[in-house]
């Protein structure tokens, strides 16, 4: 018979898998009406000053202690500072919208609104629009501010969760993030779901995308 600790571990594992599936389903729903559009040009990636602004905005949101289903999440999704999806239903319930990309869009509010609206909502959109451009860089070249797409077990080939890197890869094969719509360390130091910080393994990285100066408003 399993011990209590073993059962608790299994429950936690199952909860994480359910969350992954729900997130993937919500992102798939976002992309259902998407039609193929002309891909952006291929520029040369490089460091830009706007990175510091993006990281500061992400850090400020983490310090706000945004916990599911905080009304602040609706700002990430529907206002012009985030995705700008003003037509989306008001966010009131945990799991209602896969908002990891919306949080990245809010951090990167300096990016043109049309790009945030069209590309930031899902992993698939990043992959289909930026995957074959020079914005897509080798994971080993990751820098703070890069948009990092990760995959959990049995995830989609284009990834299933959007994060913002706050570090380069470390020697132990991990990197640091601030991200939304995930479970990790909240701004008050507790563990919960919302805007969180996390140490993630590089082996889960699917793609790394870097915003360029020409993407800025």
Task: List the model feature ranges, each with a label.
Residues 1-2, 142, 215-217:
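Short intrinsically disordered terminal tails
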Residues 3, 10, 17-20, 24, ...:
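Heptad-repeat coiled-coil/leucine-zipper oligomerization helices
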Residues 34-111:
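N-terminal capping segments
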Residues 114-187:
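...with weaker cross-activation on analogous glycine-rich loops/strands in unrelated enzymes
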Residues 169-217:
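Active-site signature of cysteine proteases
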């Amino acid at each position: 018979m399993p011990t209590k600790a073993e059962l608790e571990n299994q429950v936690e594992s199952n909860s994480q898998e359910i969350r992954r599936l729900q997130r993937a389903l919500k992102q798939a729903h976002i992309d259902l009406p998407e039609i193929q559009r002309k891909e952006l040009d291929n520029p040369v990636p490089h460091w830009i000053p706007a990175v510091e602004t993006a990281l500061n905005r992400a850090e400020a949101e983490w310090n706000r202690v945004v916990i599911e289903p905080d009304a602040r999440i609706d700002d990430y999704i529907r206002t012009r500072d985030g995705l700008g999806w003003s037509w989306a239903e008001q966010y009131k319930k945990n799991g209602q919208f896969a908002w990891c990309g919306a949080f990245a869009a809010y951090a990167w509010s300096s990016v043109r609104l049309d790009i945030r609206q069209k590309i930031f909502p899902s992993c698939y959109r990043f992959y289909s629009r930026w995957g074959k451009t020079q914005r897509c860089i080798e994971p080993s070249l990751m820098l703070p501010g890069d948009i990092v797409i990760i995959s959990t077990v049995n995830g989609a080939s284009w990834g299933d969760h959007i994060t913002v890197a706050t570090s380069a890869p470390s020697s132990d094969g991990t990197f640091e993030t601030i991200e939304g719509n995930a479970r990790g360390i909240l701004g008050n130091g507790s563990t919960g779901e919302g805007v969180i910080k996390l140490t993630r393994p590089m082996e889960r990285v699917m793609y790394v995308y870097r915003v360029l100066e020409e993407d800025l408003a």
